[in-house]
């Protein structure tokens, strides 16, 4: 066989020309210094802000500071294995997380990796964790209630779907307990076969908490059958600051999946004070200039861009909603500190919890005078509006009178009556943990309180009266509850039936 030299050289040239084209080209940099969860990297000239990078040992990081001669990278993991001179690779992807219904019932870390030992996540989609909030046009005003199951909140400080309601108070005042009860209260809505428009999925983000606390929280949800419609995102106290900083954004992205697909979700950030502390730590280590209380200048933007993502969308955009319940821990009831005032100004109201009330046995320890809901009343059902209006006024008068009553002992009959009614209503608003009430049950109980059925009872008997009344309504008089639930109103006819039922019960109650 005759082979010409020209042919050989042509084949060789062709192969040489295409040699190595299938090789992967990746932009790499070099670690200049590393420590305290921060790496300074030389190179990576075309990196984007917020881009994910990968170190030699597989640890991930995020580019936060883009400077003239180096890049400041925060490390999502331990920095012990990372050494000076090692290479760092760009991933060309902004930090993202898995989303979808496959996450329900799972516990994940701040990057969406499972940490509950139940195998890989069944999620088909991934979304960026830090995206722009919906604009003005896709939104609509809050008009559906988001029931917490707690009488003092649903009647006096109502929360609507798509609202942002802050839970604020000192340590050990029951902030997480309110969040937990809210999740448990969604169980009747999330029964199998219920319409998607009714269901409310829950996302709980634990930031900087003890692992034992998170484990206990998950255990309660599992025991009560509430884990199946919940997602837990945990960045515990032992996790690096960057993980605690990114966790709320990851949780928010998971909640947004439901909002954008015409479903409803509630997200609880527990708590944002610890996220601000983690962000302050990162910013100071990146040598960004400190501001008030040594927080960086953009700590307001950190929380506002997160909380603005909670929204009620209009019909053209699927009618979905994401409700946010951020938690803030105060020091000695100081709500005028930097982070509390920031978050109060961003949210649509706050539930203010007080240590003194907690120790007096008023639990949930909600200070009804300082707590407000700026948009929730438009989401209240007609039935609740009718009974709540009266209790609000009576409690406000009671608080005013109680302050004066401390000075004088000889009070006239009307003042005495007012104080008597107020103390009974305060007793009525107490509620043990893990026992949320349905809207129609709350309406009946509060109606009985504001119509004077508790006035002659000793304080210690109020709880027993309430429990007995609820048993009666759930048993013999269940049609009253059904009518209120279906019509969402307390008509004169239903009120008359309720009056005769409560009259009959009050006569037999001893």
Curated annotation (Swiss-Prot):
Ion transport in keyword set: yes
Sorted UniProt keywords: ATP synthesis, ATP-binding, Cell inner membrane, Cell membrane, CF(1), Hydrogen ion transport, Ion transport, Membrane, Nucleotide-binding, Translocase, Transport
UniProt xrefs under CDD domains: ATP-synt_F1_alpha_C (cd18113), ATP-synt_F1_alpha_N (cd18116), F1-ATPase_alpha_CD (cd01132)
EC number(s) from the headed UniProt entry: 7.1.2.2
Coiled-coil regions, chain positions: none
UniProt-annotated site: Required for activity, residues: 371
Gene: atpA
NCBIfam families: atpA (TIGR00962), PRK13343.1 (NF009884)
Gene3D superfamilies (alphabetical): 2.40.30.20, ATP synthase alpha/beta chain, C-terminal domain (1.20.150.20), P-loop containing nucleotide triphosphate hydrolases (3.40.50.300)
Binding site for ATP: 169-176
Domain of life: Bacteria
Physiological role: Produces ATP from ADP in the presence of a proton gradient across the membrane. The alpha chain is a regulatory subunit.
Topological type in the membrane: Peripheral membrane protein
Protein name as it appears in the record: ATP synthase subunit alpha
Recorded GO CC terms: plasma membrane; proton-transporting ATP synthase complex
Main subcellular location: membrane
Any one GO MF annotation of this record: ATP binding
Record-linked Pfam families: ATP-synt_ab, ATP-synt_ab_C, ATP-synt_ab_N
Catalytic activity: ATP + H2O + 4 H(+)(in) = ADP + phosphate + 5 H(+)(out)
The keyword Cell membrane belongs to this UniProt entry's keyword annotation: yes
Location in or out of the cell: Cell inner membrane
Similarity remark: Belongs to the ATPase alpha/beta chains family.
Quaternary context: F-type ATPases have 2 components, CF(1) - the catalytic core - and CF(0) - the membrane proton channel. CF(1) has five subunits: alpha(3), beta(3), gamma(1), delta(1), epsilon(1). CF(0) has three main subunits: a(1), b(2) and c(9-12). The alpha and beta chains form an alternating ring which encloses part of the gamma chain. CF(1) is attached to CF(0) by a central stalk formed by the gamma and epsilon chains, while a peripheral stalk is formed by the delta and b chains.
């Amino acid at each position: 066989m005759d082979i010409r030299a020209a042919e050989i050289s042509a084949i060789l040239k062709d192969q040489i020309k295409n040699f190595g084209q299938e090789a992967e080209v990746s932009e790499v940099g070099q670690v200049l210094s590393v420590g305290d969860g921060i790496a300074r990297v030389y190179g990576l000239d075309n990196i984007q802000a917020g881009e994910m990078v990968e170190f030699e040992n597989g640890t991930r990081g995020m580019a936060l500071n883009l400077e003239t001669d180096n890049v400041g990278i925060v490390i999502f993991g331990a920095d012990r294995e990372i050494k000076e001179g090692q290479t760092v690779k760009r991933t060309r992807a902004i930090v993202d997380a898995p989303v979808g219904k496959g996450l329900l019932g799972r516990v994940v870390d701040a990057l969406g990796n499972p940490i509950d030992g139940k195998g890989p996540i069944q999620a088909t989609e991934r979304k960026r964790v830090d995206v722009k909030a919906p604009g003005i046009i896709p939104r609509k005003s809050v008009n559906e209630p988001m029931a917490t199951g707690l009488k003092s909140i649903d009647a006096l400080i109502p929360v609507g779907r798509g609202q942002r309601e802050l839970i604020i108070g000192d340590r050990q005042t029951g902030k997480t307990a309110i969040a937990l009860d809210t999740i448990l209260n969604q169980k009747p809505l999330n029964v199998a076969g219920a319409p998607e428009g009714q269901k409310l999925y829950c996302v709980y983000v634990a930031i900087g908490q003890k692992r034992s606390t998170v484990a206990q929280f998950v255990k309660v949800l599992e025991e009560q059958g509430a884990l199946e419609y919940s997602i837990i995102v945990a960045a515990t106290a032992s996790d690096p600051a960057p993980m605690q900083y990114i966790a709320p954004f990851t949780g928010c992205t998971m909640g947004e999946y439901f909002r954008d697909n015409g479903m409803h979700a509630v997200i609880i950030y527990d708590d944002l004070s610890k996220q601000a502390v983690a962000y302050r730590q990162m910013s100071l280590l990146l040598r960004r200039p400190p501001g008030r209380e040594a927080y960086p200048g953009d700590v307001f933007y950190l929380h506002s861009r997160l909380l603005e993502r909670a929204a009620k969308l209009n019909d053209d955009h699927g009618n979905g909603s994401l409700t946010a319940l951020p938690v803030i821990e105060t020091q000695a009831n100081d709500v005028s500190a930097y982070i509390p005032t920031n978050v109060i100004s961003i949210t649509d109201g706050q539930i203010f919890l007080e240590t003194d009330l907690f120790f007096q046995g008023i639990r949930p320890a909600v200070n009804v005078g300082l707590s407000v809901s700026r948009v929730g009343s438009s989401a209240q059902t007609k039935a609740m509006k009718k009974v709540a209006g009266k209790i609000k006024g009576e409690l406000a008068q009671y608080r005013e009178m109680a302050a004066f009553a401390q000075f004088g002992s000889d009070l006239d009959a009307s003042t005495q009556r007012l104080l008597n009614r107020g103390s009974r209503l305060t007793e009525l608003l107490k509620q043990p943990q893990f026992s949320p009430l349905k809207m129609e049950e709350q309406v009946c109980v509060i109606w009985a309180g504001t119509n004077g059925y508790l006035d002659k009872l000793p304080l210690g008997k109020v709880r027993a009266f309430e429990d007995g009344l609820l048993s009666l309504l759930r048993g013999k008089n269940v049609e009253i509850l059904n009518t209120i639930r279906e019509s969402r109103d307390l008509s004169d006819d239903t009120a008359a039936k309720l009056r005769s039922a409560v009259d009959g019960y009050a006569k037999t109650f001893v």
